[in-house]
Curated annotation (Swiss-Prot):
The name this protein goes by in its record: Mitochondrial pyruvate carrier 4
Subcellular localization: Mitochondrion inner membrane
Sequence similarity: Belongs to the mitochondrial pyruvate carrier (MPC) (TC 2.A.105) family.
Domain of life: Eukaryota
Membrane topology: Multi-pass membrane protein
Organism this protein belongs to: Arabidopsis thaliana
One Pfam short name: MPC
Function: Mediates the uptake of pyruvate into mitochondria.
Membrane spanning stretches: 19-35, 51-67, 74-90
């Protein structure tokens, strides 16, 4: 029973014998790096980089559900990319706009 399930995974059109498995698997490195950047101060984050990560995640998440067969590895990595990108953008925006408003209020 276990061997038939493993054989089904091995022979799947998006299985380990194809680029459709390995590309999203290595793409997890980008999401893991973005999670590691949660500890980075917001002023060191880059708007263009986080916008690119977010847009890539959103666009490819949609694409992964349109192609046949559905590639759940591709979908999950891109949902993670979109989520981490949105979180990092929110941190950056909050830092940029909250810290700019504070000195103006303090000087009054």
């Amino acid at each position: 029973m276990a061997t038939s399930k493993l054989q089904a995974i091995w022979n799947h059109p998006a299985g380990p014998k194809t680029i459709h498995f390995w590309a999203p698997t290595f793409k997890w490195g980008i999401s893991i790096a973005n999670i590691a950047d949660f500890a980075k101060p917001p002023e060191k984050l880059s708007y263009p980089q986080q916008i690119a990560v977010t847009c890539t995640g959103v666009i490819w998440s949609r694409y992964s559900m349109v192609i046949n067969p559905k590639n759940w590895n591709l979908f999950s990595v891109n949902v993670a990319m979109a989520g981490t990108g949105i979180y990092q953008l929110a941190r950056k925006i909050k830092h940029d706009y909250a810290t700019e408003a504070e000195p103006a209020v303090a000087s009054e």
